[in-house]
Amino acid sequence: MANISSPFGQNEWLVEEMYRKFRDDPSSVDPSWHEFLVDYNPESTAEPVLTDPTSTDKQPSATPQAKPAAAADPVASRAKPATTPTVANGTAAGSAAAPAKTTTTPPIEGDELQVLRGAAAVVVKNMSASLDVPTATSVRAVPAKLMIDNRTVINNQLKRNRGGKISFTHLLGYALVQAVKKFPNINRHYAEIDGKPIAVTPAHTNLGLAIDLQGKDGKRSLVVAGIKRCEELRFAQFVTAYEDIVRRARDGKLTAEDFAGVTISLTNPGTIGTVHSVPRLMTGQGAIIGVGAMEYPAEFQGASAERIAELGIGKLITLTSTYDHRIIQGAESGDFLRTIHEMVLSDSFWDEIFRELSIPYLPVRWRTDNPDSIVDKNARVMELIAAYRNRGHLMADIDPLRLDNTRFRSHPDLDLLTHGLTLWDLDRVFKVNGFGGWKYKKLRDVLGLLRDAYCRHIGVEYTHILDPEQQEWLQQRVETKNVKPTVAEQKYILSKLNAAEAFETFLHTKYVGQKRFSLEGAESVIPMMDAAIDQCAKHGLDEVVIGMPHRGRLNVLANIVGKPYSQIFTEFEGNLNPTLAHSSGDVKYHLGATGLYLQMFGDNDIQVSLTANPSHLEAVDPVLEGLVRAKQDLLNKDTNGNQDEAFSVVPMMLHGDAAFAGQGVVAETLNLANLPGYRVGGTIHIIVNNQIGFTTAPEYSRSSEYCTDVAKMIGAPIFHVNGDDPEACVWVAKLAVDFRQRFKKDVVIDMLCYRRRGHNEGDDPSMTNPYMYDVVDTKRGARKSYTEALIGRGDISLKEAEDALRDYQGQLERVFNEVRDLEKHGVQPSESVESDQMIPAGLSTAVDKALLARIGDAFLAVPEGFTVHPRVQPVLEKRREMAYEGKIDWAFAELLALGSLVAEGKLVRLSGQDTKRGTFSQRHSVIIDRHTGEEFTPLQLLANNPDGSPTGGKFLVYNSPLSEYAAVGFEYGYTVGNPDAVVLWEAQFGDFVNGAQSIIDEFINSGEAKWGQLSTVVLLLPHGHEGQGPDHTSGRIERFLQLWAEGSMTFAVPSTPSNYFHLLRRHALDGIKRPLIVFTPKSMLRNKAAVSDIKDFTEIKFRSVLEEPTYEDSIDDRSKVTRVLLTCGKLYYELAARKIKDNRDDVAIVRIEQLAPLPRRRLGETLDRYENAKEFFWVQEEPANQGAWPRFGLELPELLPRLTGIKRISRRAMSAPSSGSSKVHAVEQQEILDTAFG
């Protein structure tokens, strides 16, 4: 028989069984055993040689030195004595193996005799041999409650994510290995070399696991396989090695190496209920650790669960250490068990394990029970519930990268200990006042629901909301068991992920190096957006309008809006759509589109559109809001005051994390959310949180905890969600839409994800963010991880997943081939926009006197009982007088223009800071009751004809928030959504319009050229030098003229009320869809010379060039004129007054009322009337480097040869628009007049 001191110990039976199989049929044994078995002899008496640890001759100890021999009858065989033994493990040196003995009790007739073979025979031998090892056993009872609770936390987290389970043996085995590091003697074993006793300390800890196997015949057997070099393994690696050994044991794939070299063993008889066991110690080992069953102390096993919880009784687990007393002493063994005991109760042990398993939560802590009364603890449980509602998001597992894996997601307010609660309270019942639908509940269940609601893959912030109803609604939706999507819904989510990833992969493969700002790393936003749109369709809404930055835009165009792939790929191929040849165009990731969304699991459909945007991040935000408001106003569904119908167009806004926190226009736009003139019934905000802004990490780009904190200013609920969990993303999207529909408020979704590539496809992010991209480069994408989860749950098969992706890639490939075959259009230089748009022939902007009278009457038609402010009443009376008698001033001329348009069926929208009254108290478009504060809007009376029938027109006037960027963007967007509306925005002073410069540059001036996007927005910019300082002087004419080209806008500086009247009406009626910039007056508002007669409103039209009235009426003689002063705006009146004062009939003053497009023909005709003029001057108030001169000085001589040599009269060139001193201003102004007439 085989030597009982074999290195395989109690596994020897398995080795012998394999040998017999190998002998009969080598192919029946795993090839990894062949080398070992080819010269193995189960009857060899030679024992393995244990090399002196100090020897340099390394001999394998795992392979016995044996000679081939015939197998003997196992019943009659005897173990042969060793001839020259060199090692004796567990016996005296030089002793021979004892002969086999027979029982001293003879069998009784009828007894069944069975020869013990294989494992049973080896057990007999091993147990007999173990009697020669002088052992002792230490026993220690260890509290198991902390292990139970923390294991529950771990396994619940694993179940929600990648699957798998951690056993108590995993935990205790790892603790054993860590304890061995502190007590290396426990890992030693006894040997004799050359007759000398030796304590062998192995170089590594090789932990033997006793694995119970069941054979095909149903018989059970035990093998002990070793996890090698355990001391080098971290917990996750230890678990992997453990599971690998067990799996291969059960699959019959263990090798000889797995059995050899075990230094310490772990056995777990507790799995069959044994509480306390003293296992036998095999030769070659110094100790074996036994783990008993987890049980309550015997005296409490009859107690109820409630009583046990009340008393704070926990289960115990008994650990035994059976050790070789020759080399290990009892104190060492006892201290070893004590160390394991302390370790499994320590904070550091569990912190390490949780970090290793990427459990983002703090482990349960071992603490003594708090004896406070149950009444006091009821209050503390309610405090805990409130804390989770308020701070639970800080504990949520929302970061797919987990870059700082040493930091737990926690907060002191969420710690049981902070509230005077411990793990002993988890099974106690407390009063919870209806939380979760319960009146009373165990703290364990309460804590579980709180964590499921607020701390998993979704973190919710809502306690900053002031409305209790909204808070309660969110609690009811969040604090409930989440319903798992159906298999069909899961497959649909997977199909959207497949579509998103396949699209990016295809483009990356086919168009290497092209910038496309891919969505890779954030693919879950596609099923998220799809779910939100689907939910909008479910609510029966009309349209979802999307505004977003460039990252992921192509993917959204393809997979959300439904833009044809062939069109997208054609743009990549460099083909030019001939229908776009009139525009300069823009890069492919800025373009917009429109599509129709059909519900997958419903019968509704909904319009989906994506607005065009520039690269200026967040600039599209207010534009989107204005566009949506215009669409809502056009639908006009709030006629019955039903808000559910009024806001049937939904804005969906995508952001980047760095931009949302960093761009001020975000806060400006959020501030519009609940204002009457700007409200759209709630915006769905989705932040694609890449956790980086180009190369800047969050800690360098914001001061707040989250990038979303700015949204708290409007009481919007905020949902943080892990982008690696598409099901959570879909759930949050639906919840967000439901909240928006219920409360008509903004909702913010913060989807934490990552950016697979650099800022663009040519960027290497590892240069500046190496650690992040070390993580990103090895991270599996959302599609793969979700596919694995579905397959692991058995929802779909691997083949189904692969087939779905292959099919989608095949579709893209086919489209690509189609694009290759398309007829290519040669890319030609842009013909640009049509600069010379002709005003329709016969267009009349004059109105009937009766309409002027109606408008004048409206200002005195105040409701009965309405009290007009005593300072306003004269203004209203004067307006009625002007409507009948003339001498109409600027403010009333404007109201006449707007009122007449309302009467003609136009929607007129006027907004700006203080616009209802007017910055200079000139407008009074809305009258406020002196006593009640009620409003009366006279021009709204024009919405009905004299017979009471509606005209279809509407007058809307709003005081805007103190904003330029968002306010101008909103009004621009409104004109995109309703091109027929007359939309005017007025700056408080023209100087402040530069706060909206991005909107002017990117949308107003170039939107048509880039995207074919038309706008009729009107900007009213108070402008003029009046000694009020550099910030209350200039609307920056020079900047607008520098931007102007190709007829992109119309700029005008009207100098008479009637010309302003006709300018506004022409803009509204001529059909030309271009923005209008009007530089309006300030001091001229009350200039008695700046008035117009009624016939100027009823008989003429807008005149782009004006002569002095004395020449137009043939009072003065043009032939006397030798000097012509060209000017614009209110300076005309100062020049005219000086001319009269100096009696200069040799000087003529010509006003250019429209600066761009320059009225070249009309100006030329006007100048030709002054045949004797020799000198031409451009006279302006602005400094030489500002105003119209920088452009006119170059342009006028080119367009009109007669103006060659034209000279400038102005202030000197200045860095600021004007002097800060009114006295200096007066001197400069006088100098201009003196020079003009010098």
Curated annotation (Swiss-Prot):
Residue segments, region Disordered: 44-108
Active-site residue list: H325
Task: Look up the record and name the pathway of this protein.
Answer: Carbohydrate metabolism; tricarboxylic acid cycle; succinate from 2-oxoglutarate (transferase route): step 1/2; Carbohydrate metabolism; tricarboxylic acid cycle; succinyl-CoA from 2-oxoglutarate (dehydrogenase route): step 1/1
Under the heading InterPro entries, the entry gives: 2-oxoacid_DH_actylTfrase, 2-oxogl_dehyd_N, 2oxoglutarate_DH_E1, CAT-like_dom_sf, DH_E1, KGD_C_sf, ODO-1/KGD_C, THDP-binding
Please state the Enzyme Commission number of this protein.
Answer: 2.2.1.5, 4.1.1.71, 1.2.4.2, 2.3.1.61
Record field: catalytic activity:
glyoxylate + 2-oxoglutarate + H(+) = 2-hydroxy-3-oxoadipate + CO2; 2-oxoglutarate + H(+) = succinate semialdehyde + CO2; N(6)-[(R)-lipoyl]-L-lysyl-[protein] + 2-oxoglutarate + H(+) = N(6)-[(R)-S(8)-succinyldihydrolipoyl]-L-lysyl-[protein] + CO2; N(6)-[(R)-dihydrolipoyl]-L-lysyl-[protein] + succinyl-CoA = N(6)-[(R)-S(8)-succinyldihydrolipoyl]-L-lysyl-[protein] + CoA
> Region entry 2-oxoglutarate dehydrogenase E1, C-terminal part: which residue ranges?
347-1238
Gene3D superfamilies named among the record's database cross-references: 3.40.50.12470, 3.40.50.970, Chloramphenicol acetyltransferase-like domain, Multifunctional 2-oxoglutarate metabolism enzyme, C-terminal domain, TPP helical domain
Q: Which UniProt keywords apply?
A: Acyltransferase, Allosteric enzyme, Coiled coil, Decarboxylase, Lyase, Magnesium, Metal-binding, Multifunctional enzyme, Oxidoreductase, Thiamine pyrophosphate, Transferase, Tricarboxylic acid cycle
Q: Which family does it belong to?
A: Belongs to the 2-oxoacid dehydrogenase family. Kgd subfamily.
* Entry protein name: Multifunctional 2-oxoglutarate metabolism enzyme
Organism of origin: Mycobacterium leprae (strain TN)
